[in-house]
Every structure is written in structure tokens, then in C-alpha cells.
Amino acid sequence: MASSISEQINHLRSTLEQHSYNYYVLDTPSIPDAEYDRLLQQLSALETQHPELITADSPTQKVGGAALSKFEQVAHQVPMLSLDNAFSEDEFIAFNRRIKERLMSTEELTFCCEPKLDGLAVSIIYRDGVLVQAATRGDGLTGENVTQNVKTIRNVPLKLRGSDYPAELEVRGEVFMDNAGFEKFNIEAEKRGEKVFVNPRNAAAGSLRQLDSKITAKRPLMFYAYSTGLVADGSIAEDHYQQLEKLTDWGLPLCPETKLVEGPQAALAYYTDILTRRGELKYEIDGVVIKINQKALQERLGFVARAPRWAIAYKFPAQEEITKLLDVEFQVGRTGAITPVARLEPVFVGGVTVSNATLHNGDEIARLGVKVGDTVIIRRAGDVIPQITQVVLERRPDDARDIEFPVTCPICDSHVEKVEGEAVARCTGGLVCPAQRKQAIKHFASRKALDIDGLGDKIVDQLVDRELIKTPADLFILKQGHFESLERMGPKSAKNLVTALQDAKATTLAKFLYSLGIREAGEATTQNLANHFLTLENVINASIDSLTQVSDVGEIVATHVRSFFAEQHNLDVVNALVEQGINWPELTPPSAQEQPLAGLVYVLTGTLNTLNRNDAKARLQQLGAKVSGSVSAKTDALVAGEKAGSKLTKAQDLGIDVLTEEDLINLLEQHNG
């Protein structure tokens, strides 16, 4: 009997999985929805009677599980990179040209094109064909574990079809809510008196990030796969489109508009076609993604910053509306940048209500010729940032008034300075300016800086507004009573904050330098400064020439660092912080044995086949070398990989030593790097 029940259950599962595959992957439903539901109910009833036969990959397990208290963090083994954007045909043509120049090829490229879905990127890991983990993109390196929620999405297979899949397979794609599902969901939510969402993307995000997966299971979420991440035993196909076809064979849904095209003109035609049919599609999109199809070419092109060179998101023109400019206010940022902000009559555009827009700077105001009282065209650039793009001059009222850019800071009345060659005007008040003061202290306390637990933005705002602090150093003279006087701060929270401030005094030189908020000096830069100069005094006294000797520090960053420490009020704050007990472990200069390449300048060019470019750079730096991005008379050696171009020619002209990748590997092994 048990065998018969087991056979019934297995038969129902395979039948339901086949119908799901027909419906979601092949887009050819083979039975009515009611019949599918009836079969699912039969399976559920049998599993309820025989719980020992329930498996994790059963279609009935898409109903959700126990609620979570919070999402755990998941590190992506292969980073989930973002894409560079193109907003015009010229920008896409430039992208195509850059690729061909880098490949040194005149042949037309094959592109894989697909709509850019307006949802959330997720990673789904299958182990031995079974879904074991799902995570959001997060910051690209770390995301949130949403496994239980993704399991409830109806077109996500809990078990892959077939048997030829890798032992471990990471599938990447987009979770979204189609237009019909979104409309139905909002209507039902409104009837129940619950929150309605302004657009499908917000609805998808809110649904996927539910701590209770049973709630997610009731939401009409969908998933389309678009790539892979980690794959056991290497790639599953020689080109991207073949890879997608393999995914569909294994039961994963693919956007039906995905298409292979030859050459840039065909890619542009695809873009135009999708843009024309945008309103007819069943889901929201904000552009198309265009990728080089051949995996070998993708590997040769590699990555820049946090985006691949071989793909681009060609965004659609933002949706536009007409509204009225009511006023312009000037905001002051942490670095003193003066930014004009347009206050608008609220208008619904691109899925949200917009009442503010950036005017960027004085040059943009002059270019637009805009006045207060004008009727303007507003758009959301890239469907994100509201912008004024045009003035409707025929509607200009008689009482329209010019926008006067301030000559003094609207916050502290200090002089406003506009450096030649820069579009941004800045307040010269530094840490005297309350606007900069708040942002400077928030930056100082942030996680990547001194990481002062409990010192949130609202507390900083209150401390500055009440004039309890004027500089970061003032934080360390505050007593528990000062914090207890703030809104929503009880004795326990105040005591914890005092303790956190004391704990934060023990830091590193790199974090301390980062906490000062020097323009364009990020985490990597301040770490390199600390490693190079070893002491705060050395950094303070460093000349621009000596600063540019630091790895990854160019003349612009060096100038910002030098200018910061040339200002006495900045030095006063630094000295006060040290006097308050900020400290870090003493750094000792590495020995000649530890850094045998100290003082030497290397340049990497071309494709490295054995070493990862970033790994090679890091290993050279560990041995004391400076790795530069350009060849000059100061370069000691050039490492030339395959397809080395103009840098190799210049190095040969200058008589600079040229190393092969094999030479570099031998050099690193010689010095145990």
C-alpha cells in the first residue's frame, strides 16, 4: 500500500512539474489553471496523510515556512556586479567601438539582447539539482538570505529537470511582479484596507523581503533567469545564449524576448523594437541589456570597477511630465558643495510623485535659462533621479524671477568659492559650517570610519542643533547626561553610547584618516596612505610629490590631501582628537626582505591568462612595488600579457624592461609573493 501511495505522490509531482514547465518555461499551458490546482490539492492531501513522504522539492512546499526574526547575510562567492548604462545611441556605439578596439577586431560582434526587467536581482544556488539557497544582490558582495521566500515563487523550480546539470549551479535572474499580478494584488489589498504599492518594483521588493515566507507565497512574484554565477567544473556552454538554453532545459524560466543579434545595428533595432512594444509587454522594463555572446570574448574583456566591459544596460528615455517651478533652495553638502534644488508642484512621473529635482549647479541653471515661476519639463533620468530638462518658454509668466546663485553660504554665511575648471561651487566654511559639520560628524561616526555604535543621524542632528558639539572631537567630552537630554534617549541608551565612544577610540591609522572626510580619499586610498607613511605626522607633512608616490594616489587626490592638512582649523580638529585619546597600533616599516620591490614602479597591460589582474597587482604591492596605470620615464618594468597595445609600444620606445606573464610568475615565486 505504501508503495502505491508513494507511486501516486511521485506521479502527481512529475505531472505538476511538467505542467509548470509547459506554463512558465515553454509558455504553452497544457491544462487549465483549475485542473492544476485540483492536482496540487490531491498531492497536498496525500502528503498530509503521509508526512514521511514529503520532500523539499515537492510543489506543495511553495507555501512558505516559519517566520524569521531577521534576514541573515550571505556572501556571494562570485560578486554580483552592476552594469554600466548607455542613455543614447551614441553611447551604445561608443561601447561597441571600445570593445572592438580592446579586442583589436574588425569583425561584427554577436550580442545577446534581453529586456531590462524592473525588479530585484537574486542569486539561486542548486546543489545536485535541488534549490538550497537564494540571496538578494545586496551590495554585490553580500546579500540577504531569502531562500524560503524564493522557494514560494511559482515559476522557480525547487528541483532541476534532467540529470546533466552541474553538481553546483548558481543561477542569477530577476524577481518581479508582472502588470496583471500587480494590478490584482493592489485591488485586493485595497479591499482589505491594506497598503497598496505605487509600482510593480516596489511591490516585488516588499514581497520578497517579507520575514514571513507565507506572506510572500501569497504574492504574485515571478522570476526570469539571465545568467549564471558559480558553476562547478567550469562553464556550462561556450556562449551566453547556449547557457540560457541549458537553463531552460533544466526547468528555469527565461524572458521570452531574449534574442541573439549580429552587429551593433541589429542591437539598436532590437532596442527600438522593445521600446516601441514596451507598453504591450506583460511586465515593467526600463531598458534593454546587451551582452557579448561569446564567453571567450567576455573573459578577454574582463571587468572595470564593478561592471563587466562586455555588457551594457541601454536605458529607455525617462518618462516626462510638465510641472511648475515654485522655488529654488540651496543645499550644502559634507564637502561644502552648494547644490540648487528645485521645488516643484508635485507631479506623478516614472511611477512616483516628484516634488523636488536637482539643478546640479550654476552652469546648469544658466544652460537651461530657467526662472522661478517657469513651467518646466521634468523627467527621471535613468528612471531614478528627477531632473529638469527644458523650460516651456511660451508659458513663462510676467512675474518670473531670476535664480540668483549665492555668493555666501546659505547656512554659515562664509564665502562661496568656485574653482576654475570645476562646475561645483563650495562653501569655504569647512568645519565651521553647520551643514558640513553634521555631515562631517556623521561620516566620522560611520561604520567604515570610527564605527561609533548607536550614534545615528538623528542624534548627530540634535547634538549639532543644540550646539553641544561643533567638531568630531567634541563627541568625546560629552557625558551621559548630555545624551540623556536628547529626545528618545534613556539612561541605558545614553550609557551605551558613552561606552561606544570610548571603544571607538581604539582604531587604525587608515580608519582615522578615512574618518576625516578628505575629498576623494576612500577606504583603499587611506589604507595605502597609512601603509606608505606609517605615522599621522608623516601624512600631515607629506608633499604632493611624496603623496603621488603612494600606490593608487594621483595628483588630484594628493592635492586634496595636502590642502586638507594645510588648513589650520583641520589640524586643530585632528590634534584635539588625538588629545581626546584616539589611538591606533604603531605601524612598523617592512624590512627589505619583506618588500624586495620597494621603490619600483610596475605597469600591467594586456590579458593575463594564469593570473587574475587584481591578484597580480595586489601581490606586487605586497612586495613593495607601486603599480601604475600608465607608462612613463619613472616606470621600471612593464608586464605585457596577450594583446598588449600602446603601453607596450611606449615602454619599448622608452627602453623599459618588458616582462611576460611567465616572467612575472617567476618573479613572484622568487620572492614568495
Swiss-Prot record:
Enzyme type, top EC level: ligase
Active site residues according to the UniProt entry: K116
GO biological processes: DNA repair; DNA replication
GO molecular function, one term: metal ion binding
GO cellular component: cytosol
NCBIfam families listed in its UniProt record: dnlj (TIGR00575), PRK07956.1 (NF005932)
Domain BRCT, first and last residues per copy: 592-673
Residues annotated for NAD(+) binding in this entry: D33, A34, E35, Y36, D37, S82, L83, E114, R137, E174, K291, K315
Highest taxon, organism lineage: Bacteria
InterPro entries per UniProt: BRCT_dom, BRCT_dom_sf, DisA/LigA_HHH, DNA_ligase, DNA_ligase_AS, DNA_ligase_CS, DNAligase_adenylation, DNAligase_N
UniProt function note: DNA ligase that catalyzes the formation of phosphodiester linkages between 5'-phosphoryl and 3'-hydroxyl groups in double-stranded DNA using NAD as a coenzyme and as the energy source for the reaction. It is essential for DNA replication and repair of damaged DNA.
Annotated protein name in UniProt: DNA ligase
Sequence similarity: Belongs to the NAD-dependent DNA ligase family. LigA subfamily.
UniProt EC number: 6.5.1.2
Cofactor(s) of this protein: Mg(2+); Mn(2+)
Species annotation: Pseudoalteromonas translucida (strain TAC 125)
Catalytic activity, reaction form: NAD(+) + (deoxyribonucleotide)n-3'-hydroxyl + 5'-phospho-(deoxyribonucleotide)m = (deoxyribonucleotide)n+m + AMP + beta-nicotinamide D-nucleotide
SMART domains: BRCT, LIGANc
UniProt-annotated binding residues for Zn(2+): C409, C412, C427, C433
Entry keywords, A to Z: DNA damage, DNA repair, DNA replication, Ligase, Magnesium, Manganese, Metal-binding, NAD, Zinc
